[in-house]
Amino acid sequence: KHIRAYHTGFILPLVDFLILYPILLVMRRKTTHGIQLQYHGDKQLIEQDIRHGAFFMTNHRDIVMDAAWLTFLLRTRYFIHPYFGIGNNLFGKWWIEHVVRFLRAFVVIRNGGFRDQVNNATTLSQYIRHLRKRHKSIWLAQREGRAKDGNDVTQPGVLKMLTIDAEDFFQSVKELNICPVSISYEYDPCDYLKAREMQLKRDNPKWKKSRKDDLVSMKVGINGQKGRIVYRLTPSINHEIDKALAAQPELRELSRNEQIQFVCRLIDQHI
């Protein structure tokens, strides 16, 4: 009860400065050759988007460190600690869920039947909307799972979940204030694990990862050498959506799937 009551007011800042921040400082020194935050486009416009609370959508390179380094950079420069999503398939140990929830994570439930998946997606979408109405910043990867082959393409299912109960699709997307971010690691410590997974899937299409495999990837991704790391922020896609709708009003008449594909392309172009 104490943790719940003071989660955002007292306990969380202590976690940031007394535990999480020093750990990331050590990891930056031991596992990287430096981390940069860069801007693509109008920096003032990007910072304005950030101040109003942004939905940071990135390509996906590492299970843990993608969100961790973004939090480190945003906390250091803008004193922002984003909420972030993590799949329940990664809870290989009982304590992981409790730790990530304490660090402002929300759980993306990926198992269950069709009806369960729809209900879970609706609940998650409503929770994200609740955070955005409070101008909280959020991180979510553009796809389920890391891009093993480096082909960074936004999965339509992510946008379907985010707008699952929307009447006006484009307005619903604009309310999220999606700011695409590109992540680049000079070295991928999990490259051999990703190659192994692709090979096993090619040899046996029915092969599936175990929770132990995910834990190994998490450990290697945290401790492995990454070289230089660059996070590049881009402006909110809202500006381009407004321009596109003004020039092509017929976009509003497209099917929902076509509208989703249009926004996916915008995000991909930014990343």
Question: Locations of the language-model features?
Answer:
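Glycine-rich, often proline-containing surface loops adjacent to acidic residues and nearby aromatics
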Residues: 49-52, 101-107, 135-143, 230
